[in-house]
């Protein structure tokens, strides 16, 4: 098994040049050619930003609804009450509740990919914050997941909303589609993501904003992208 994996990786690495920087269009083309798994691999972009997340004013966090979705069926949980529960259900939410949902989560129920809540339910959500937080599921106003417009939030989540947040080392990782997507759709999704991240550049960030960029599949080596080209996307 290990020998087969090594041969597969060796073949993939032979298709790229480690020290080469690719333009967006060529990079997408190369990454698609690396698809070799028996499942539809996820295309992921990784950006190294010139920010220091230790400073609150340099924390880059937000959300973007990809033009062509992520290719993944997203299950959405909503914390709401009264008429807002009905709005959530009508919009297609998979799980809707209040204190009862919090109790289910405490008992181990995590069968959803995104959590949305109305502002008045955040006290209830806070009771399971230690469970949701480490899994990246805690609702936040910056990602549009704490809102009174529940229908819109659920629709966005189902349509391919991607939430992103810079990590401690200044990196942002985000899925932008599947290997089966046409090149143009992958490219357009990536440009929409990068455009959003560029808009969120902190005024206190110094020097080059996007320092490095790479594109990869779930089971492939990464391809280096032209960071300057990405910074020029408005």
Curated annotation (Swiss-Prot):
One Pfam family named in its UniProt record: Ribosomal_L1
InterPro entries reported in the protein's UniProt record: Ribosom_uL1_bac-type, Ribosomal_uL1, Ribosomal_uL1-like, Ribosomal_uL1/biogenesis, Ribosomal_uL1_3-a/b-sand, Ribosomal_uL1_CS
Keyword terms of this UniProt record: Repressor, Ribonucleoprotein, Ribosomal protein, RNA-binding, rRNA-binding, Translation regulation, tRNA-binding
GO biological process, one term: regulation of translation
GO molecular-function term, one example from the UniProt record: rRNA binding
Keyword Phosphoprotein: no
One GO CC term on file: cytosolic large ribosomal subunit
Function per UniProt: Binds directly to 23S rRNA. The L1 stalk is quite mobile in the ribosome, and is involved in E site tRNA release.
Subunit structure: Part of the 50S ribosomal subunit.
Family label: Belongs to the universal ribosomal protein uL1 family.
Name of this protein: Large ribosomal subunit protein uL1
Origin organism lineage: Bacteria, Pseudomonadati, Campylobacterota, Epsilonproteobacteria, Campylobacterales
